[in-house]
């Protein structure tokens, strides 16, 4: 038996954060019904270039959608009155609703939290948006990069001092989906105690802000926050002779000592946190790594018991 066996979820969400949340709930045993608006499906097809594919190719892509796994899907234009009646009937028998529309959109269709609570006051309604249901940015549309930008997390990303960088991964999306699922589970426990439903307001910008927690806790005086980028030589990504890469993270002194002895530079040991020495050390480390292939370095680093990992591509990581 899974944690959410017997729970029913009505999922209005369309892009990554909301569907990731409902996918996690499905993995925990919930019965998830996904509402897909035909007009939204066509919009997404244009966004991702699927409109140029044949019908068979589009169907194959949809069938491979990880975030649809374990869910039932109903194609329903929620802008029609008849669709509203169907959704209200579904809401009567549901425990959880997940949505990712901007504030006011579902309310304007008569499908907001208050509308659904009239037929089911014990509903847990989880709303996922860029910047939440309140505040000056509540009506802003946007995806993962904007959450990273508005939270300040993007300002810390990358090694270049002249400009911030995009991580290239949907970090805020996945974090928000995970946080949303966690919030739903907490609301389920609370409902068991109180018998009351709950409205959950999940902002992608808040989830992305969590990425700043470490630096903010160490620097309550924001003027002391160090510049973006690496400031130490004991971590890095190094190109090998065969074009492969090795990542190292010898932050603890004992691992750094082992690494320095391995590459025959014990004089670096006391310079571990010396930012002035970093560039010269890194340049030398880079040249050293280019003398051997990735498998050769894996063997040497493993023997020396340092902290390292080959940088695997997705095919290698899935093996």
Task: Locate predicted features.
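Generic structural signal for residues in well-ordered beta-strands
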Residues: 74, 200-202, 308
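Active-site-adjacent beta-strand anchor residues
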Residues: 77, 99, 202, 248-249
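Conserved Rossmann-fold dehydrogenase catalytic segment
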Residues: 133, 161-170, 192-206, 225-230, ...
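Oxidoreductase and adenylate-handling cofactor-binding alpha/beta cores
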Residues: 177-198, 210, 214-220, 260-264
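Short Gly/Pro-enriched turn/cap motifs at secondary-structure boundaries
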Residues: 56, 64, 225-230, 236-237
């Amino acid at each position: 038996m899974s944690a959410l066996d017997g729970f029913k979820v009505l999922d209005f969400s369309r892009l990554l954060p909301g569907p990731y949340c409902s996918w996690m709930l499905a993995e925990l045993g919930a019965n998830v019904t996904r509402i897909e608006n035909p007009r939204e499906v066509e919009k997404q097809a244009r966004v991702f270039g699927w409109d140029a594919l044949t019908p068979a190719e589009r169907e194959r892509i949809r069938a491979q959608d990880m975030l649809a796994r374990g869910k039932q899907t109903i194609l329903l234009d929620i802008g029609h009155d008849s669709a509203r009646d169907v959704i209200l009937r579904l809401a009567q028998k549901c425990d959880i609703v997940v949505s990712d529309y901007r504030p006011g959109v579902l309310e304007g269709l008569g499908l907001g939290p208050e509308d659904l609570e009239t037929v089911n006051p014990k509903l847990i309604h989880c709303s996922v948006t860029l910047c939440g249901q309140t505040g000056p940015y509540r009506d802003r549309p946007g995806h993962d990069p904007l959450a990273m930008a508005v939270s300040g997390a993007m300002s810390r990303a990358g090694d270049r001092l002249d400009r911030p960088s995009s991580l290239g991964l949907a970090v805020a999306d996945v974090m928000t989906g995970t946080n949303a699922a966690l919030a739903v589970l907490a609301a389920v426990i609370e409902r068991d105690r109180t018998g009351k439903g709950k409205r959950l307001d999940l902002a992608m910008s808040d989830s992305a802000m969590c990425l700043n927690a470490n630096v903010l806790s160490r620097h309550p005086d924001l003027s002391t926050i160090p510049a973006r980028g690496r400031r130490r030589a004991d971590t890095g990504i190094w190109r090998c002779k065969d074009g492969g890469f090795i990542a190292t993270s010898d932050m603890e002194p004992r691992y750094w000592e082992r690494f320095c002895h391995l590459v025959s530079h014990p004089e670096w040991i006391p310079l571990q946190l010396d930012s002035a020495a970093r560039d010269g050390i890194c340049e030398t480390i880079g040249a050293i790594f280019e003398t051997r292939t990735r498998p050769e370095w894996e063997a040497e680093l493993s023997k020396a018991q340092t902290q390292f990992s080959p940088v695997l591509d997705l095919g290698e990581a899935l093996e």
